[in-house]
A protein has these predicted regions:
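A short glycine-rich, His/Asp/Glu-containing loop-to-beta-strand
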Residues: 49-80
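A short hydrophobic beta-strand segment most commonly corresponding to one strand
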Residues: 93, 133-149
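Extended, aromatic/histidine-rich regions of cofactor-dependent oxidoreductases associated
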Residues: 144-164
Length: 164
């Protein structure tokens, strides 16, 4: 009969905290960037008073910067869209704060309502559009900070049949 118990196998759980790393001041992993976006989204006092709507162009505001990342706030009136684009060498997290946005990619079309979050890697081509009847607001975290946004033809976001 084995006399080992869980405490002997795993060690005393109360001794583990000294092994944990202290929380980082700035995010460095995809999960931490997504968490940053969720935290900002949940704290309306950080962004709600800044939002503006512009019928002639998409409004945007750089909300925060940190080592190797930027956080942007964007508003979208009905009918406004980004055009088909990627984010160069940047990865990103898109979080819808208010309203509904539609994301078109080469594989799918997704309705993103408030609280929805999309994470993407460099080279991810998409188009984001407000095709609803109400304005929308979104939060974008780019890491590293956004230095380019190459535009693509509309066909790069259309679903195409698979050929052998």
């Amino acid at each position: 009969m084995n006399s080992d118990n869980d405490l002997q196998i795993a060690g005393d759980i109360l001794e583990v905290p000294h092994l944990l790393q202290p929380p980082r001041e700035h995010p460095v992993t995809v999960a931490e960037f997504a968490g940053l976006a969720r935290a900002i989204a949940a704290d309306r006092a950080q962004w709600e008073h800044l939002v503006r709507y512009d019928a002639t162009t998409r409004w945007y505001h750089r909300l925060r910067t940190g080592p190797g990342y930027e956080v942007w706030l964007l508003s979208w009136v009905p009918g406004q869209g980004s055009g088909s684009h990627d984010h160069g060498r940047s990865s990103g997290v898109l979080t819808v704060l208010e309203g509904t946005l539609t994301e078109h990619t080469g594989r799918a079309t997704r309705a993103l309502s408030a609280g929805a979050q999309r994470v993407f890697a460099p080279g991810y081509v998409h188009e984001v559009v407000n095709d609803a009847l109400e304005p929308a607001v979104s939060l974008h975290v780019y890491y590293p900070g956004l230095t380019e946004m190459p535009m693509h033809t509309a066909q790069s976001c259309e679903a195409r049949p698979v050929t052998a």
